[in-house]
Amino acid sequence: MGKKILLIDITRCNGCYSCQVSCKDEHVGNEWMPWAKPQPNTGHFWYRVTETVQGQIPVVRVHYMHTMCQHCDNCPLIEKYPDCVYRTEEGLVIIDPVKSYGKMSMVYDCPYGAVFYNTTSMIPQKCTGCVHLLRDETWIDKEPRCVQSCPTDVFTFGDEDDPKVVAKLATGEYETYHPEYGLKTHVFYKG
């Protein structure tokens, strides 16, 4: 199993928010140990769609930005908290929900703002890449819920050597979010 890559073609996004809603549906009230405790119902968006409107009626352009954990190869959280943040064999960055108890500072240490602090469980939390689904033998799709739920094919998800991932990256149309950070992320954007 290779490192997972997520490609997001935001030019295909129509703002339906299925990705954001499906993430909430998957994680609110559900415990996926050892990877995650339940996400709070409000205030946390491990997968977030932000809408930007430009222009005036009748000429309006809407842009939808998708943000979540970028699952960085050079993850500053792994470097700063090696006792409670680790990388899975899929290349996903995981905050251990037991060992990270009380470590609110992680919220401020992620340069992408992808970490939230659960004040009920007293733990930092973020996107897990739905590692629990990727490892579930009964989950046929073998992709995160955000990817599985998209009606407009915004996403391409697969191993770093998957031909469809390699072909799309080879076009040069995809880039990382804030490449100047130098963190070698596993999420790439087009548009």
Residue ranges of model-derived segments:
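Non-ligating segments of multi-cofactor redox enzymes
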Residues: 1-191
